[in-house]
């Protein structure tokens, strides 16, 4: 995982050779190593959001991390069980909504979300809108932190590899 890529060629008859690794694969290997070295929630977010990797484990990691971050912001505030159950259902929708926004696609409208949760539009605006916005903000921050973290990780790996080669 922390080893630098080593260029090489596979020998063929009559002195010709083909690369073992295609140049594009070779040049992107450091990014792949950087992503795979991240904390699980960062890795899951980047793989799901940017590589379209729909692995169930990534979705579970994103949802669990998102709910933990959201619950921490509630700071022990009392809430009806049914409301909390509906909010749990929204956390994955918030992740999908942020992914859609980042890709320039349509996002959920409040009326649509109220229908999905099974509440009136009035109840949505009074009870759920602020929670929805908080959830979306959590995933937007996750996106920013993940991208920053992978960039830093790659820079550290490249610097280490340059140092190790000298």
Question: Residues of each region from the PLM?
Answer:
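N-terminal interaction/assembly modules
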Residues: 1-78, 106-123, 128-166
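Short, amphipathic alpha-helical "recognition" segments used to contact nucleic acids or chromatin
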Residues: 48, 55-56, 84-108
């Amino acid at each position: 995982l922390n080893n630098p890529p080593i260029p090489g060629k596979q020998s063929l008859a009559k002195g010709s050779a083909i690369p073992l690794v295609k140049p594009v694969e070779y040049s992107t290997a450091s990014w792949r190593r950087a992503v795979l070295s991240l904390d699980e929630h960062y890795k899951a977010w980047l793989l799901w959001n940017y590589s379209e990797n729909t692995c169930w484990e990534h979705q579970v990691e994103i949802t669990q991390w998102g709910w933990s971050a959201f619950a921490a912001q509630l700071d022990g505030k009392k809430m009806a069980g049914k409301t909390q159950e509906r909010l749990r259902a929204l956390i994955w929708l918030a992740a999908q909504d942020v992914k859609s926004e980042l890709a320039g696609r349509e996002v959920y409208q409040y009326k649509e979300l109220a229908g999905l949760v099974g509440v009136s539009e009035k109840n949505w605006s009074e009870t759920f809108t602020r929670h929805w916005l908080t959830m979306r903000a959590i995933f937007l921050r996750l996106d920013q932190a993940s991208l920053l973290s992978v960039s830093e990780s790659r820079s550290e790996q490249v610097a280490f590899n340059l140092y190790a080669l000298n």
